[in-house]
Amino acid sequence: MNPPFKVHILGCGSALPSKSHNPSSQIVEIRGKYFMIDCGEGTQVQVRRSHVSFSKLYAIFISHVHGDHVFGLMGMLSTFGLQGRIAPLHIYAPAHYEELFLMEKKMFLSTMDYDIIFHPLDTTQSQVIYEDRSLTVETIPLQHRVPCCGFLFKEKPTRQHFLRNTSLPRPLVPLPPIPVRAYAYCSDTRYIPTLGEMLRSKCPGPLTIYHESTYADDKKDNAGKYMHSTAREAAMVAKSADAQQLLLGHYSHRYADETLLLNEAQEVFSPTLLSQEGEVYDV
């Protein structure tokens, strides 16, 4: 049986406040490790509601420095210190954020008893930024109004396993390899026609994609103007990537009911879901 590989949705709204959604944030749970992606305002409250322990977070990945993706970071890091965290925490974020982050760290976190290690990212190229025995995390260059990248979480292949059957001439029978699962977080970006093909080339096994879907077709001009994507465009990426499933998110506040977004995406790629706060999705 495959070990857990899950995505916890903490926030799936966009920049303007909404009664129904929180700003962007997710937790990726893989093989007992927990990684946060983006940290919009109020994220630490959502973590409490998710029942994921603060102490289990190893690293935080920031896709870009817009407030709805980063305004919750300092408050949460301060809470970690108040809780007595001593384990180091790794922050991966676009390089131009480092100067401001260090200023905020000096002002708000100077008395904390745990180390915070900042890893500056080059958002213009794909590169492996984290690796352990079972996992790699790679950047996905995106196209937004500020430097921005997504993140590709991918399992490493496991060693081949054998089934012992003493009734056969050759008692060790090789078992089929376990498919390598992957999760692609595609944050704020305009539609990139080559993105799906790139993901398909990197992910031969089951692939789940989260792709921003700020607008429906009725606001496609806004998507182009503000460098966002429509739900249909997100589905085009998933179809091109031959993905297993697509999670929509980053909904504009103008849509009180996101069913319109879902319907337009499913016209192109049927295994599409509306991500929702509090939901946990298997990869």
Please give the residue ranges for each predicted region.
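Metal-dependent catalytic neighborhoods of phosphoester/phosphodiester hydrolases
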Residues: 73-80, 256-264
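General small-molecule cofactor/ligand-binding pocket signal
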Residues: 8, 92, 117-122, 138-140, ...
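Short, surface-exposed connector motifs at secondary-structure boundaries
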Residues: 31, 57, 83-88, 240-247
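Active-site neighborhood of divalent metal-dependent phosphoester bond hydrolases
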Residues: 85-89, 95-122, 254
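Active-site neighborhood of phospho(di)ester-bond hydrolases with catalytic His/Asp-centered motifs
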Residues: 37-40, 57-65, 69, 94, ...
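Active-site metal-binding motif and surrounding structural segment of the metallo-beta-lactamase
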Residues: 41-92, 120-122
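Metal-dependent phosphodiesterase/nuclease catalytic metal-binding core
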Residues: 27, 122-249, 257-270
